[in-house]
């Protein structure tokens, strides 16, 4: 008895909670509810003939046309727009038996899915397929009231909607601009890398040429020093020999003068004169040979002096060339320092690029994980579709039996037809759940894409 009492209390508590929720919904419906004439007038204003009598005794085709107009106005969706997707779904599910679900019913089911999403946004959370096929006055008044109030609210917020739409367009344009700037930065980075490689080759060539010029400069300096030493030695030898020549010339003149003085004395003794003459001839020959040798030596020294003058000019040209080479070396050193600074800047940017590549690899791994998750969702959807296919096969068998027994079991066939409709509704719910899962996966992918673009933006700021 105590157990039954607790169950009774729980049932009454649940019933009271349900009654309070129902009462709150009724109050909301009463606030949103519009008169029949106002609803009919609003529908007439959109271009569809409609009266209060049509609302009291609704025609499903007319009601579907009104719903289709509202869906086209608010969502740009009609039966024709959902036909390709429903046809593809029918081909996947029904396979070789596309006539199981008629075309009109199929399109109406797809339109119902889109319309129910609109109704949930409008506040009608209990919208069913029966509201399209078998509408009632109370349901239509509630649904149309919510729809019309939603349209009025939307028209009053047109400026805000346009503002958010413009912000979205600006964001898309900004994303495209940033993407193009990223491409340009990557191209500039590649060009800088190519120019770095080209500059490295030029720097190596200039360093090699610089080393060759340094070696040649050192060799020319050594040659200059040797030539200068030889020139100094030759000049000293020339001065010494000129002094000797002048001394011997002076001695020869003095000797001649002495000969002239001694000539009268020599005339007195022929023998002594002959001997003196012989001696003087020998001395003269020796002096003459020495003078010829000295003249030859002087000519040789003059030739050497001219040669040294030419060599001195060459040395001056070499010195000028060395000065030019030193200027070129200074320029090369400046270019080398500039190239080193550029190389450091490029290495720093290379480090930034490596960091970006690491970030990109991390994002690629995250993207791969999300792709795997999406693939798992697709496999799950495929499994559910296979289950639905098996269920459809069962329904075909049931339909075949119903056709055979239609004449004698009309009432049983009606009950089975209702069961088939319920099964189709479950299939539609299942398809909607699959679409919701795919939509959520797509939203996750968009979030991941926005994160990637954010990282790219941060990378561009760093660059």
Swiss-Prot record:
Residues 337-354 have a biased composition (Basic and acidic residues). It is found in: Nucleus; Chromosome, Centromere, Kinetochore. Keywords: Cell cycle, Cell division, Centromere, Chromosome, Coiled coil, Kinetochore, Mitosis, Nucleus. One of its GO terms (cellular component) is nucleus. Residues 1-14 have a biased composition (Polar residues). The keyword Kinase does not apply. It comes from the Eukaryota. The keyword Nucleus applies. GO terms for biological process: attachment of mitotic spindle microtubules to kinetochore; cell division; kinetochore organization; meiotic chromosome segregation; mitotic spindle organization. GO terms for molecular function: microtubule binding; protein-containing complex binding. Residues 166-455 form a coiled coil. Residues 1-26, 331-354 are annotated as: Disordered. It holds the Pfam family Nuf2. Belongs to the NUF2 family. Component of the NDC80 complex, which consists of at least ndc80, nuf2 and spc24. PANTHER family: KINETOCHORE PROTEIN NUF2 (PTHR21650:SF2), MEMBRALIN/KINETOCHORE PROTEIN NUF2 (PTHR21650). Acts as a component of the essential kinetochore-associated NDC80 complex, which is required for chromosome segregation and spindle checkpoint activity. This is Probable kinetochore protein nuf2. It comes from Aspergillus fumigatus (strain ATCC MYA-4609 / CBS 101355 / FGSC A1100 / Af293). The gene is nuf2.
């Amino acid at each position: 008895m105590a157990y039954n009492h607790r169950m009774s209390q729980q049932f009454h508590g649940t019933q009271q909670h349900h009654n309070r929720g129902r009462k709150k919904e009724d109050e909301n419906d009463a606030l949103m509810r519009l008169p029949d004439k106002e609803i009919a007038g609003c529908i007439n204003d959109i271009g569809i003939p409609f009266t209060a009598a049509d609302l009291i005794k609704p025609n499903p085709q007319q009601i579907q046309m009104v719903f289709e107009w509202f869906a086209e106005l608010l969502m740009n969706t009609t039966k024709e727009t959902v036909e390709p997707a429903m046809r593809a779904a029918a081909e996947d599910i029904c396979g070789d038996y596309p006539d199981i679900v008629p075309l009109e019913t199929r399109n109406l089911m797809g339109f119902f899915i889109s319309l129910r999403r609109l109704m949930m946004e409008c506040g009608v959370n209990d919208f069913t397929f029966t509201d399209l096929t078998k509408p009632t006055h109370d349901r239509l008044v509630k649904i149309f009231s919510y729809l019309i109030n939603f349209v009025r609210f939307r028209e009053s917020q047109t400026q805000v909607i346009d503002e958010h739409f413009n912000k979205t367009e600006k964001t898309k344009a900004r994303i495209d601009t940033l993407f193009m700037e990223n491409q340009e930065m990557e191209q500039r980075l590649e060009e800088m890398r190519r120019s770095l490689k080209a500059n490295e080759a030029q720097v190596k060539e200039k360093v090699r040429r610089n080393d060759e010029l340094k070696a040649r400069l050192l060799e020319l300096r050594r040659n200059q020093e040797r030539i200068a030493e030889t020139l100094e030695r030759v000049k000293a030898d020339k001065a010494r020999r000129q002094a000797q020549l002048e001394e011997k010339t002076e001695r020869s003149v003095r000797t001649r003068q002495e000969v002239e003085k001694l000539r009268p004395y020599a005339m007195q003794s022929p023998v002594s004169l002959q001997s003196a003459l012989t001696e003087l001839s020998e001395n003269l020959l020796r002096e003459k040979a020495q003078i010829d040798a000295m003249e030859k030596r002087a000519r040789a020294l003059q030739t050497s002096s001219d040669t040294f003058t030419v060599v001195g000019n060459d040395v001056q040209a070499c010195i000028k060339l060395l000065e030019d080479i030193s200027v070129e070396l200074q320029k090369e050193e400046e270019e080398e320092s500039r190239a080193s600074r550029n190389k450091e800047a490029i290495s720093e940017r290379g480090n930034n690029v490596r960091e970006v590549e690491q970030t990109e690899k991390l994002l690629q791994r995250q993207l791969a994980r999300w792709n795997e998750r999406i693939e798992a969702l697709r496999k799950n959807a495929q499994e559910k579709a296979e289950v639905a296919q098996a269920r459809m096969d069962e329904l075909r068998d049931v339909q075949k039996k119903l056709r055979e027994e239609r004449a004698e079991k009309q009432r049983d066939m009606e009950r089975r037809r209702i069961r088939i409709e319920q099964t189709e509704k479950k299939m539609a719910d299942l398809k909607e759940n699959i679409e919701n899962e795919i939509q959520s996966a797509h939203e996750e992918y968009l979030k991941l894409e926005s994160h990637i673009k954010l990282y790219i933006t941060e990378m561009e700021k760093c660059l």
